Amino acid sequence: MAENNVYGHEMKKHFMLDPDYVNVNNGSCGTESLAVYNKHVQLLKEAQSKPDFMCNAYMPMYMEATRNEVAKLIGADSSNIVFCNSATDGISTVLLTFPWEQNDEILMLNVAYPTCTYAADFAKNQHNLRLDVIDVGVEIDEDLFLKEVEQRFLQSKPRAFICDILSSMPVILFPWEKVVKLCKKYNIVSIIDGAHAIGHIPMNLANVDPDFLFTNAHKWLNSPAACTVLYVSAKNHNLIEALPLSYGYGLREKESIAVDTLTNRFVNSFKQDLPKFIAVGEAIKFRKSIGGEEKIQQYCHEIALKGAEIISKELGTSFIKPPYPVAMVNVEVPLRNIPSIETQKVFWPKYNTFLRFMEFKGKFYTRLSGAVYLEESDFYYIAKVIKDFCSL
């Protein structure tokens, strides 16, 4: 584990967290660093200093530099990446503008994030599609999973497969790179939900080249809130549109041979959001200054594992050890049922923390997230909180 004087509570000075708030739920909202926040505010001020110049010339130019930095981080050609506000935006953009044909099938997982399911259901109803689901447990055998995927491909010949890199709850790491290879083999469109990937799971998208992939920079990369990278394979640039439709779509319609239309479409659709997207470059710089991706990911993985060990021992339950470098852990909790939202609204402020819980296949779990500002003592406190929560 990294030296204590580098990671742990000393790191809190780099974030805007309440000093007494115990944040073991980074996987939900992420944690923006102070350096990134300051850069974001600076960019917002610049955007208002000369609105027309900034909106139409300078901000798009700054955006290009950030795209290049992000491309290096995830091993992609910068021409294949654009920004949108969330993973929900990403999946909606792909599913709602893709050129479906009647009776196409979308295949997905039972642990898909709810908004992915909603978007798939909407596309199904709009275009008269078929929707099928692969059921998985809280742990998967990679070979058996891939065999099941291939069997489904052969049996029902889906048009597209939506697969997670790392599912939200329960936390499951999927062999997404091998899934993409299978999709290529059977000419199936690969749509990869990488919401928890960038800053968390190393990626080389030029090598894997999924058809579509979206990943939230605000979760694990310490970027401003609502900031998502959307990867679109070069061959698919003309298959989707940016939502909402904007001037980029108009340019596309006018040009018989459009140049870099993907970038134009998305920049025009999100012009007012460019400052926060540009600030992602500062997030990459900040993370380099505190040790770099490999060291950060190692610490987050190790402290999440240690936290799960502490809590499961205190509760007398078990946890599912995630593979490296996953920094989210499923811990079983002795709940009989999950308290109401109204009860939780009173409970969590009292304890100055927050956790998510779910029932999955007859067991209750909470999800722990590692972070550079956490230490073992935080998880002893969380164990006490969970005990009190389970007694509600």
UniProtKB/Swiss-Prot annotation:
GO CC annotations on file: cytosol; nucleus
Cofactor: pyridoxal 5'-phosphate
Main location: cytoplasm
Top-level taxonomic group: Eukaryota
Pathway: Amino-acid biosynthesis; ergothioneine biosynthesis
Top class in the EC scheme: lyase
KO phenotype (gene knockout): Shows substantial decrease in ergothioneine, accompanied by accumulation of its immediate precursor, hercynylcysteine sulfoxide.
Localization per Swiss-Prot or TrEMBL: Cytoplasm; Nucleus
Enzymatic reactions: S-(hercyn-2-yl)-L-cysteine S-oxide + AH2 + H(+) = ergothioneine + pyruvate + A + NH4(+)
UniProt modified residues of type N6-(pyridoxal phosphate)lysine: K219
Regions crossing the membrane: none
Keyword Nucleus: yes
Pfam families tied to this protein: Aminotran_5 (PF00266)
Any one GO molecular function term: hercynylcysteine sulfoxide lyase activity (ergothioneine-forming)
EC assignment: 4.4.1.-
Gene Ontology BP term (one): ergothioneine biosynthetic process
Keywords: Cytoplasm, Lyase, Nucleus, Pyridoxal phosphate
Main function: Catalyzes the conversion of hercynylcysteine sulfoxide to ergothioneine by cleaving the cysteine residue at the sulfur atom, the last step in the biosynthesis pathway of ergothioneine.
Family label: Belongs to the class-V pyridoxal-phosphate-dependent aminotransferase family. EgtE subfamily.
Name by which UniProt lists this protein: Hercynylcysteine sulfoxide lyase
Organism of provenance: Schizosaccharomyces pombe (strain 972 / ATCC 24843) (Fission yeast)
Gene from which this protein is expressed: egt2
